[in-house]
Swiss-Prot record:
InterPro entries given in the database record: Glc/Gal-6P_isomerase, Glucosamine6P_isomerase, Glucosamine6P_isomerase_CS, NagB/RpiA_transferase-like
Cystine bridges: none
EC number: 3.5.99.6
Source species taxonomy: Bacteria, Pseudomonadati, Pseudomonadota, Gammaproteobacteria, Enterobacterales
Active site: residue positions: 72 (proton acceptor), 141 (for ring-opening step), 143 (proton acceptor), 148 (for ring-opening step)
Notes on activation and inhibition: Allosterically activated by N-acetylglucosamine 6-phosphate (GlcNAc6P).
Gene from which the chain derives: nagB
Gene Ontology terms: cellular component: cytoplasm
Role summary: Catalyzes the reversible isomerization-deamination of glucosamine 6-phosphate (GlcN6P) to form fructose 6-phosphate (Fru6P) and ammonium ion.
Subunit structure of this chain's protein: Homohexamer.
Protein name: Glucosamine-6-phosphate deaminase
Organism: Klebsiella pneumoniae subsp. pneumoniae (strain ATCC 700721 / MGH 78578)
Record flagged with keyword Transcription: no
């Protein structure tokens, strides 16, 4: 596992965007051989999306031959709702780059048959072979996507009940009213995530410090979903300074020395 210890949220977003752009450009995607990118929503990736849009406008990257799969979507929220993840992605990213509409894949939280929708999503991912890079965030309790504590580390795309803590955290997007936050969501599974060629998780803020400590210094544990990264051959965590407050000094020193060349120029 790689840990990229930075200082600010803006630096985390810039590093993540630069990493994605480098991966896409090195892949040299074509219409017949697209780069497959997994994407998250929420507050954490906003700086990364902003940086990606800026790099696209500067001519440094094209998304014309990129196929995307989003991590999750609320159940029962109309896709036109401003807080649906469909709306979020278009507002913050898709509407500002050159990705074709047919290359965008989002779960349908209003599908008449939820199980069939989850199977369809898994099959669509498999039809491309694999996701080349999956970017994600992490919750205070260590959840990735909506794989809440005690999620199976072999799980696939499915419906999940959201914990009260997650709904309270997400209520900031619903005028602070937890009752407006959906109780269920569709989410890719931990196994789906681990199937990706590379997984990059962004961690911001002191409230994520225990989750980061579990991921880097703890044992693999289904109560801390983020620890699944220890099982992945190519996992990278990009974090800001406040999120590292629970890490041992020697752990942080080790990764700072290891990644010194990779964190220059931010």
């Amino acid at each position: 596992m790689r840990l990229i210890p930075l200082v600010t949220a803006e630096q985390v977003g810039k590093w993540a965007a630069r990493h994605i752009v480098n991966r896409i450009n090195a892949f040299k995607p074509t219409a017949d051989r697209p780069f497959v990118l997994g994407l998250p929503t929420g507050g954490t990736p906003l700086t990364a999306y902003k940086a990606l849009v800026e790099m696209h406008k500067a001519g440094q990257v094209s998304f014309k031959h990129v196929v995307t799969f989003n991590m999750d979507e609320y159940v029962g929220l109309p896709k036109e709702h401003p807080e649906s993840y469909h709306s979020f992605m278009h507002r913050n990213f898709f509407d500002h780059v050159d990705i074709p509409a047919e290359n965008i894949n989002l779960l349908n939280g209003n599908a008449p048959d939820i199980d069939a929708e989850c199977r369809r999503y898994e099959e669509k991912i498999r039809s491309y072979g694999k996701i080349h890079l999956f970017m994600g965030g992490v919750g205070n309790d260590g959840h990735i996507a909506f794989n809440e504590p005690a999620s199976s580390l072999a799980s696939r795309t499915r419906i999940k009940t959201l914990t009260h803590e997650t709904r309270v955290a997400n209520s900031r997007f619903f005028d602070g009213d937890v009752d407006l936050v959906p109780k269920y969501a569709l989410t890719v599974g931990v196994g789906t995530l681990l199937d990706a060629e590379e997984v990059m998780i962004l961690v911001l803020g002191h409230q994520k410090a225990l989750a980061l400590q579990a991921a880097v210094e703890g044992n693999v544990n289904h109560m801390w979903t983020i620890t699944c990264l220890q099982l992945h051959p190519k996992a990278v965590i990009v974090c800001d300074e406040p999120s590292t407050m629970e890490l041992k000094v020697k752990t942080l020193k080790y990764f700072n020395e290891l990644e010194a060349e990779n964190i220059k120029g931010l």
